[in-house]
A protein has these predicted regions:
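Generic structural "secondary-structure junction" signal
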Residues: 35, 49, 67-73, 114, ...
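Polybasic low-complexity intrinsically disordered regions
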Residues: 53, 57-60, 78-235, 242-244
């Protein structure tokens, strides 16, 4: 269904421009992996919440994934490290925002964008735990992590200096938090904002309102966004907070 709805070739100009892919002057050597093919790998990975290793395994295991991506044989499936390197390169060259805008414009052209309300909620993205010294962790907490490991670039490229620890419901998380704006009717993602996991929901939310949202449109918000109402009202949309019950104070029928 997705491959019929979206022609992924529309992303090729952005991918080739950002990744600075030059035209091959000869057929010598191994051909580089097609950027649109790798972008489809990223799409499948994000859609199903797969790690790099899981993405490699699942694409090898599922014919439907290979058909969607355009991979003929299992031997042609990119390995986990190739997937990681491609994602890092997309991040480094700042391609994601342009790709998302292109995706949004394409959905609009298909008539899939309807301003009948949006939902904003946050979810954790877990990162591999870092093995740093106490002094290194203190430097990272001060926001000075970029000054570390400059004498060892290979080690530095494997270090995550932006992920943070947080607790929720008695569970501990290390990584990031995705704040997503979703169309209430189609459930398509209309916008996103990524922060470290330690940033509370109440510190984000209104930043996701943009010119594509209708005046007065209702925004349904998770209870974590209590206190952000003024920011939404200032942008001419209507916030509705999902109320939460507490011990001894359960929600009534009206709530």
């Amino acid at each position: 269904f997705i491959s019929k709805m979206i022609d992924f070739e529309i992303f090729r100009p952005i991918l080739e421009s950002k990744l600075q892919i030059a035209e091959r002057k000869s057929n010598a050597g191994r051909r580089p992996i097609d950027p649109v093919l790798m972008f489809k790998v990223m799409f499948v990975q994000r859609l199903y919440g797969l790690s790099d290793e899981q993405a490699e395994y699942q694409i090898k295991d599922r014919t439907s994934f290979r058909d969607f991506i355009g991979i003929c044989t299992v031997d042609d499936v990119p390995d986990a490290r190739t997937i990681w390197k491609y994602r890092e390169e997309l991040t480094r060259c700042g391609a994601y925002d342009e790709l998302f805008k292109q995706f949004y414009a394409h959905l609009q052209s298909l008539g899939l964008i309807v301003n009948e309300g949006k939902i904003i909620d946050a979810s954790f993205v877990v990162s591999p735990r870092q093995r740093n010294t106490r002094d290194e962790n203190q430097t990272i907490k001060k926001g000075e992590g970029d000054s570390l490991w400059n004498d060892n670039p290979h080690k530095k490229c494997h270090k995550d200096i932006d992920a943070r620890w947080t607790k929720k419901g008695g569970d501990t998380f290390y990584g990031y938090k995705n704040h997503a704006k979703v169309c209430r009717k189609t459930k398509l993602i209309m916008g996103y904002d990524t922060t470290s996991a330690s940033v509370h929901d109440s510190k984000r939310g209104a930043e996701l309102v943009d010119d594509n949202d209708a005046v007065g449109e209702i925004f349904w918000l998770d209870a974590g966004y209590v206190g952000t109402e003024e920011g939404f009202v200032s942008k001419s949309v209507t916030p509705v907070i999902c109320e939460k019950g507490f011990r001894g104070r359960p929600l009534n029928e009206e709530q």
